[in-house]
């Protein structure tokens, strides 16, 4: 597939694109060892996202160095997601982080950030053509509650709890993922930004007011109501 790039890990072959959003594209990847196949999900975030974005920033900056620094700061922001995911290693209620690589372009301003994670089924795909059983609904609520409890222990606010950011393991466990806009609470209390999805967003966010980890509880409540 011409739309599937080459993996930065030679042993992992990108098979197909399985997701795309404002925080990058996600691919299913396969590694073959001793006749057995293993799978991972690899998210690739390109900064800048397009030549148009690069040209737009260039037109506003005084020089090439300022343009490079602007995008380098965005790279550091994205690496924040990786640091956030590392906090959750070993937690069964959050998507497991496995590895990452940052590759800087040689001929132009730009970076590709590859994040390798466990391969799971998206909640939206899991629900396609079926209704959740009462047992599954209860388990979904309990698993997400445990994920948010752990977030609170680490002073991390997810800020975008919604169906698209929930995943399901082959054992039927529900996991919270995509910490692309998550931040450690201590770093965001004095300078909060409006990020999240309006359908599940706490009023404090879209009103531009200060908020704390309770906003994830509000999103969780909205999610259960749906």
List each language-model region with its residue ranges.
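Activation segment signature within eukaryotic-like protein kinase domains
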Residues: 140-141
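Conserved activation segment of eukaryotic-like protein kinases, specifically the C-terminal portion
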Residues: 192-204
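Conserved small/polar residues in nucleotide/adenosyl-binding loops
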Residues: 221-226
